[in-house]
Amino acid sequence: MDYEFKKNILDGHYYCHCSMDHEIVGRWVQEEIGKESTKIAQVLALIVAARSNPTEELCLNGTEISLMICGDEVTVQDNALLHSYELEAESEFELYDCESVACCGLEDFEQLIQQWQLFVRR
């Protein structure tokens, strides 16, 4: 998974852009953890817990996007997609799955979070 971080010098907002098929991961980083050190620490602690309990699924439910870790697999999914599956609603306006869910390895995800932490501290 490739990614790039940017900071808007005019308004101070931080941005995380991830490669195609991982766009939702970038959105999750921006919208759910942002530059808040406590949230970043919470995610890093969840990664440590996942390594200690590889058979347990660990979740961090966000306002719009949620994170799930099971073993060495990380899934980031738009909450609206979860609700659309629950409701089994068929609609031409349903979210495009590829932009609403992404999976990556735990090591890649941990590296992304660590690099994000360093970037927002600058």
Curated annotation (Swiss-Prot):
Residues of the signal peptide: none
InterPro entries per record: UPF0231
Taxonomic superkingdom: Bacteria
Similarity annotation: Belongs to the UPF0231 family.
UniProt xrefs under HAMAP family: UPF0231 (MF_01053)
NCBIfam families with a match to the protein in the record: PRK05248.2-4
Protein name per Swiss-Prot or TrEMBL: UPF0231 protein VV2750
Organism annotation: Vibrio vulnificus (strain YJ016)
Source species taxonomy: Bacteria, Pseudomonadati, Pseudomonadota, Gammaproteobacteria, Vibrionales
